[in-house]
Amino acid sequence: MNLCLIDPFKQSDVPETVEYYLVDPKNIKSNCASFNRRGTLLAVGCASPIGKILVWDFDTKKIVRTLYHHTGCVNSISWSRNGKKLLTASNDGSLVLWDLATSKILYSLELESPILFAEFHPRNNDLCLIVLQKGTDPILLNFKSSEKTPLNIKSLVTSYIKREENSTGVIPTSVNSNYNGVATFASFNRRGEKIFFGDSCGMISVLDFKSMTIDRQFKVASSNTTVKQIEFSRNHRFMLVSSSDKVLRLISLESTNLYQQMREYQDSVNRMHWKKCCFSSNNEYVVGGMNHKSIHSIFIWSVSGSLVKDLEGPKEGLVDVVWHPLRPIIVSISFTGVIYVWTAYFEENWSSFAPDFQELEENLDYVEDEDEFDAKDSDNENQEVNNNNNNNIGRNPYKKIKTQQELNDKNSEEEEFVDVDHNDRITEFSSDEEEDLFCFSAIDDRYVSNVKFDDPRHPLYEKYQKDKEDSSSTTSNSTISSSSSPSPSSSSTTTTTTTSQKKDETQKKEKSTKKERNSDSKKRK
């Protein structure tokens, strides 16, 4: 796609349609997905019986890595901050740390309970947080020392209350002294400064990572509600909580130690549970994937609370949904394991590329008149102009009527005289017309002055001989024609010859007369 042709005023930052989909070559179902920090790679965990991991190049849509180790369904995938390591967790209780450059296993751990969620520490790739099946405490794992630290919320709350009571003499009100909840979910915030725990009592517990103490607890739902997922926005301002009461809650993190609920999002029509939730890359939208076996529905709300888009996919359930880190793209996984890529619809504006290009809102079929393209003479055209000017009712609005001036110009063009006998001299030529030029070689003056035309060395010798032959043939032809049929010119020549003969005879007679006279005079004497 050419970005120069996209109208900047109509660009949408919300996905609207499925552009393409990704399928495992061996038709193994996908179960979870995660982008790296830049969104160039997409890691996909597959379901049973082969819990392999596929790493897709999101630009070329090709598989660049295939990792095998798990025997159960892969439930969670987490990228390191530098994008060189991958952390995967499975239903079989295995946790694996991968080196993507070599496809080798850097660390592996086998637990007795299925692992539901695992993620890297946002600032330290040597630490990770593990969430196990309900009833088991979350674990903080150090890869270097292999130290596993269980995080029991009840014991942490009790120790915090005792410490505060001993130091101040007052029981702190920021925590519940009668807390009996069980952790169901845990996650680092964006900076890794705190760990947020969700439990089975609809409460969120905040653990300070440095002091490893619970310093805050707040309720988000009723006591019999389970917190299923916690997500954080990229700008560190909001937290999104998904619970079992079919409601997504937006909580503000701007105030220190004051977590205020801002919005609630739910499907008021179907009243379905939410399978997954996330934030958009620009922190302006909240996404919720519906948990239904035959409906692939994704709701997009603005942070202000209004519903922006309801994306309807194929008639199959949704397993996971993630938003691209930088672009308006959503990746969703269906029950059949197909990965759908949702993108925004960009409307290309060709008028910005070609200013003289006119855009049409709709296509119009033009129907011409029966005699529109018939050949007509000037009289008929003049009559047509008069008729059209007098009555324009019922005419085709797309047909252009010729004016009298246009008809006169057309007639003048037809009557224009074109001289084909004489060609104007071309004063200049381009390089493409050099083949049309004719060049003559100059004649040396010495040949003209010293050499005669009948000399073969003369450059015009051949032309001279040819002209001579032509003249001789012309003379012979004229002689033959004069002898065969006399003409007025021949008669005049004969008359001139006769007159000259008479004159000569007269002169001879005069001479003879003079001689006789002289002889007579001599005799007399």
From Swiss-Prot:
Chief location of this protein? Answer: nucleus
One Pfam entry for this protein is: WD40
Biased composition (Low complexity) is annotated at 383-392, 472-500
Q: Name one GO cellular component term.
A: Set1C/COMPASS complex
The record, for InterPro entries, names: Apc4-like_WD40_dom, RBBP5/Swd1, WD40/YVTN_repeat-like_dom_sf, WD40_repeat_CS, WD40_repeat_dom_sf, WD40_rpt
Can you say where the WD repeats lie in this chain? 25-66, 69-108, 222-261, 267-312, 313-352
- Indicate, by first and last residue, each region the UniProt record lists as having compositional bias (Basic and acidic residues): 462-471, 501-525
Query: Does this entry carry the keyword Nucleus?
Result: yes
Chain's role: Involved in mono-, di- and trimethylation at 'Lys-4' of histone H3. Histone H3 'Lys-4' methylation represents a specific tag for epigenetic transcriptional activation.
Name of this protein? Retinoblastoma-binding-like protein E
Q: Which organism is it from?
A: Dictyostelium discoideum
